[in-house]
């Protein structure tokens, strides 16, 4: 299973319609588009998927639709994390039922939980996942939970934990984790340092911009396998030029707008309170979509 979890995993966006409801047809197209890019898997229902502005029923529906489109074709990881252990367990059970390959959960947030409470939270989810491996999700910038290296080392050695999504930007810590846990599947979480993350010991990555240019990240992996660091650096620079623009537009809404221009997503809106893309960025996003479509062709 560890080998199946390695690679380039797109953190899947969740399309909505003009009424802010789940757009299941756009979601199906997006899953197929990602498969067509040659990515290794999908990370479903995470930060990029706007999970925390969805109901539990909606999150289950997303898991079901993605499984219908992609089960058996690529690796599927269900992010089931919520601030509630019981709700996370419910989503983990759904992931097992729909045939996902693994579950993942962000550290419980908002309340100042003790570290032992964090551990108990993960143990309960792992139990409900009924044999599916757990990917611990460390993203201190959004969760507000700043785990120490010792705490990370403890979490990744809990029975049932097979992987870590490390979205901290700390490459030294990435290398320390790899050194301490040579068999752990380790994902780089920040797209803009993907190549550096691989050099620091990551097995692959989980990222939002893979939705529109997954082949570039696969190219970075291949270049490093071949020892061509200069090529990997060039590809990372091209990815980062895109990320520069998306930071200005707002990453999720910018990605949806690009996918709208690619005829993948019908409505380029995130769920409120996220606002639409500022119209001044639309020409640049349309040009980017055209460039990427030509590059992919």
UniProtKB/Swiss-Prot annotation:
Compartments where located: Cytoplasm
Lineage: Bacteria, Pseudomonadati, Pseudomonadota, Gammaproteobacteria, Enterobacterales
Oligomeric form and interacting partners: Homotetramer.
Keywords assigned by UniProt, alphabetized: Carbohydrate metabolism, Cytoplasm, Lyase, Schiff base
UniProt cross-references to NCBIfam families, sorted A to Z: nanA (TIGR00683), PRK04147.1 (NF003164)
Free-text function comment from the UniProt entry: Catalyzes the reversible aldol cleavage of N-acetylneuraminic acid (sialic acid; Neu5Ac) to form pyruvate and N-acetylmannosamine (ManNAc) via a Schiff base intermediate.
Keyword Lyase: yes
Reactions performed catalytically: aceneuramate = aldehydo-N-acetyl-D-mannosamine + pyruvate
Main localization, broad class: cytoplasm
EC number: 4.1.3.3
Protein name: N-acetylneuraminate lyase
Family stated for the protein in its record: Belongs to the DapA family. NanA subfamily.
GO biological process: carbohydrate metabolic process; N-acetylneuraminate catabolic process
GO molecular function: N-acetylneuraminate lyase activity
Principal EC category: lyase
The protein's annotated pathway: Amino-sugar metabolism; N-acetylneuraminate degradation; D-fructose 6-phosphate from N-acetylneuraminate: step 1/5
GO cellular component, one term: cytosol
Catalytic residues (positions): 137 (proton donor), 165 (schiff-base intermediate with substrate)
InterPro entries reported for this sequence: Aldolase_TIM, DapA-like, NanA, Schiff_base-form_aldolases_AS, Schiff_base-form_aldolases_CS
Sequence positions that bind aceneuramate: 47-48, 167, 189, 191-192, 208
Organism: Salmonella paratyphi A (strain AKU_12601)
Coiled coil (residue ranges): none
């Amino acid at each position: 299973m560890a080998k199946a979890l390695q690679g380039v995993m797109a953190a899947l966006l969740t399309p909505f319609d003009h009424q802010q409801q789940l757009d299941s047809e756009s979601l199906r197209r997006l899953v197929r588009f990602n498969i067509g890019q040659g990515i290794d898997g999908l990370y479903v229902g995470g930060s990029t998927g706007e999970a925390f502005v969805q109901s539990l029923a909606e999150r289950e529906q997303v898991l079901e639709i993605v499984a219908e489109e992609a089960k058996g074709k690529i690796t599927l990881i269900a992010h089931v994390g919520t601030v509630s252990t019981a709700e996370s367990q419910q989503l983990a059970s759904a992931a097992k039922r729909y045939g996902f390959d693994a579950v993942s959960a962000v550290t419980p947030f908002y309340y100042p939980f003790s570290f032992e409470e964090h551990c108990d939270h993960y143990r309960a989810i792992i139990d409900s996942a009924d044999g599916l491996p757990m990917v611990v999700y460390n993203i201190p910038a959004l969760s507000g939970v700043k785990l120490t290296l010792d705490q990370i080392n403890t979490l990744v050695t809990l029975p049932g934990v097979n992987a870590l999504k490390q979205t901290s930007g700390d490459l030294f810590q990435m290398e320390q984790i790899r050194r301490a846990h040579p068999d752990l599947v380790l994902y780089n979480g920040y797209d803009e340092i993907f190549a550096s993350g691989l050099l620091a010991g990551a097995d692959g990555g989980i990222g939002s911009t893979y939705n529109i240019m997954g082949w570039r990240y696969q190219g970075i992996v291949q270049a490093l396998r071949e020892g061509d660091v200069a090529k990997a650096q060039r590809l990372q620079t091209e990815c980062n030029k895109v990320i520069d623009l998306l930071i200005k537009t707002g990453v999720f809404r910018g990605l949806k707008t690009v996918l709208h221009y690619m005829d993948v997503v019908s409505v380029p809106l995130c769920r409120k309170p996220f606002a639409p893309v500022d119209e001044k960025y639309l020409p640049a996003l349309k040009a980017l979509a055209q460039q990427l479509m030509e590059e992919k062709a």
